Regions:
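Transmembrane beta-barrel wall of Gram-negative outer-membrane proteins
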Residues: 147-180, 191-239, 267-271, 277, ...
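Extracytoplasmic beta-strand/coil segments of soluble accessory domains associated
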Residues: 53-85
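Outer-membrane beta-barrel signature, preferentially recognizing the C-terminal barrel domain
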Residues: 369-375, 415-418, 446-500, 517-539
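Short, acidic, small-residue-rich periplasmic hinge/interaction motif at the N-terminus
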Residues: 1-45, 65-66, 74, 106-108
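N-terminal periplasmic accessory domains that precede
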Residues: 4-12, 52-55, 89-90, 105, ...
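Short acidic/polar hinge/loop motifs at secondary-structure boundaries
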Residues: 58, 84-110
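Face-selective signature of the C-terminal outer-membrane beta-barrel domain
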Residues: 209-234, 259-409, 430-439, 492, ...
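Outer-membrane beta-barrel translocator domains and adjoining extracellular loop/strand segments
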Residues: 116, 148-149, 179-191, 237-254, ...
Length: 541
């Protein structure tokens, strides 16, 4: 300004028309590296998926429905959240899709993971910025065409001050779901027996869980934290009936109805302590878990069966089961840059103590069980990864020792007590070619028979089916070569596996009674299997 207003800054009003601003979420990015497929969730359309189940069901190679999570061709995965193994299913319930940064799916886990692991899902959450107090609350209800009602509510609170973070979480849910199955069992002897069952059950579950956590971030490279969780299922209910018939050479010989009423309760306590940091160039990742659980179950079965031209017969079977479990597990991974790549050396140890009591009335039908198992697992592993231009290579080797001791009514059972020691190599290559990403990996996994399938006793299932174990089972080992390809919203997988000593279930005649099947596990002949999968996830609009 001039004159007497010289040196005075004057602001003059003006107006500008802003153009229309459209904010769009992008397609999720997919990265193939180190044996896994990583999908970016943050700032993509997947952020709007809602619950973790809805999110995981939209991740390539994953199916998540009705509380069941599976990796295609591999089965139920082990889940890690921010590098820590999830041991309580309710941990997923406290997350939602808008909290997630990325999800990695590993269909062929390498040396870092327990050899019994078929698949791994690693979930990384967003880091919340800023200090102060905050909370979020969510509630949801559902009602389907079969009159199944359910719903949940959750509250998550946190307080942050500089590097300190305190958190508290509470969750409650009530769910109702059907369990419907139609089964047919054929037994070929001197005559052909055909058993047909139509099962219509309803499961009802009530859940309450809570969690307290504390963490402190010393700097960008070092953080320490601990958490304590509680889970309670005050009601685990199954009600319903099974209707069946028995045919002999296509002639009806018997009809039956089984009315089932089951009530259970379960309680879990767990805690975790972790440290992630660096000392110079040495990276340290340590965590330890403690887990305790106790559960009981009462099962009442009212059976009515009638042979042709005979009177109706009735049998009431009552059984009770109680379980008590303890677990402590620790794992440490040390990493260091070496020869242009990254070398990781690690070890882990876990100890499990399980107690099971099973009683049945009348006890002439099957054996009462009072058993205990002590299982120790120790492992050491090494992995090395390096980039050669666009080509990424990761190689690993793991040694695992498992020792479990089985006690029947306090008596040590040598036949069912086992010690295993095995080596497991792994190797993966990944490389982008233009817009196409490709990955080739090799790994092996093992299915060791647990004490329950090694048992000698017989357990009553229903009037026509008993169950037992097989003390002579050996471990099933699968060696897999997997090829993955990703292009925009398309992913493709081709897997070849060689399975040695596969474990599967068979049904035999029980005590020369063709109408009663005895189910048990056996080892079959080795076989080869090839599977492929194509996932298309385009986004419209």
């Amino acid at each position: 300004c001039a004159g007497e207003n010289a040196g005075v800054i004057k602001m003059v009003a003006d107006s500008k028309m802003l153009g229309e601003v459209v904010v769009k979420s992008s397609l999720p990015k997919t990265i193939l590296k180190n044996g896994g497929i990583t999908t970016t969730v943050a700032e993509s359309v997947l952020e709007k998926a809602g619950t973790m189940e809805h999110l995981l069901d939209r991740i390539p190679n994953v199916s998540a429905q009705n509380g069941n999570i599976a990796v295609f061709g591999r089965g139920e995965p082990i889940i890690y959240i921010n590098g820590r193994q999830m041991r309580d299913r309710s941990e997923l319930d406290r997350l939602s899709s808008d909290n997630i940064k990325s999800v990695e799916v590993i269909s062929n886990p390498g040396a870092r993971y327990a050899a019994s692991t078929k698949a791994v899902i690693r979930i990384t959450t967003k880091k919340i910025q800023g200090d102060g107090f905050g909370f979020d609350a969510t509630t949801e209800g559902s009602y389907d065409e079969k009159k199944n009602m359910g719903g949940y509510g959750r509250l998550n609170m946190y307080y942050r001050k500089q590097g300190l973070e305190l958190g508290a979480y509470a969750y409650g849910a009530k769910q109702s779901s059907p369990d419907e199955k139609d089964l047919q069992q054929m037994t070929y002897l001197d005559k052909t027996w055909n058993q047909q069952d139509k099962t219509r059950w309803k499961n009802k579950t009530e859940t309450f869980s809570s969690r307290l956590n504390i963490s402190y971030q010393f700097d960008n490279n070092n953080s320490l934290g601990a958490s304590f969780s509680f889970l309670r299922n005050p009601k685990l209910i199954t009600d319903g009936k099974t209707e069946g018939s028995v045919l002999r050479d296509e002639d009806l010989t018997e009809t039956n109805t089984s009315i089932r009423s089951e009530f259970g309760q379960n309680s879990n306590l767990s805690s975790n302590i972790y440290y992630v940091g660096k000392v110079g160039k040495l990276g340290i990742d340590f965590n330890t878990d403690w887990f305790w659980s106790k559960g009981n179950n009462k099962n009442n079965i009212d059976e009515h069966y009638q042979e042709v031209n005979s009177d109706m017969q009735n049998q009431l079977v009552n059984s009770t089961t109680s379980k008590y479990n303890r677990l402590i597990a620790s794992k440490i991974v040390l990493s260091y840059p070496l020869l242009g790549g990254d070398l990781s050396v690690g070890g882990e140890y876990s100890f499990t103590n399980r107690n099971t009591n099973y009683a049945i009335i009348p006890n002439t039908l099957a054996d009462n069980v009072r058993d205990r198992i002590k299982e120790g697992m120790s492992a050491a592993f090494v992995t090395y990864s390096r980039d050669f231009g666009k080509l990424n290579m990761e190689a690993g080797l793991r040694y695992e020792n498992v020792d479990f001791k089985y006690y029947d009514d306090g008596k040590y059972m040598a036949e069912q007590s086992k010690t295993y020691g095995d080596w497991f190599p792994s190797l993966s290559f990944s490389m982008p070619i233009g817009n196409v990403q490709m990955q080739l990996s090799y790994a092996a996994d093992i299915d060791r028979p647990n004490y329950w399938v090694l048992r000698s006793g017989v357990q009553y299932s229903n009037h026509y089916t008993y169950e037992t174990g097989n003390p002579f089972l050996v471990s099933e080992i699968s060696r897999d070569i997997s090829y993955d390809l990703a292009y925009k919203w398309l992913t493709f997988n081709l897997t070849y596996e060689h399975v040695s000593d596969p474990i599967y279930q068979t049904v035999e005649m029980y005590k020369d009674n063709a109408t009663i099947g005895l189910m048990r596990m056996i080892n079959g002949k080795s076989y080869n299997n090839v599977s492929s999968m194509l996932t298309l996830q385009p986004t419209f609009g």
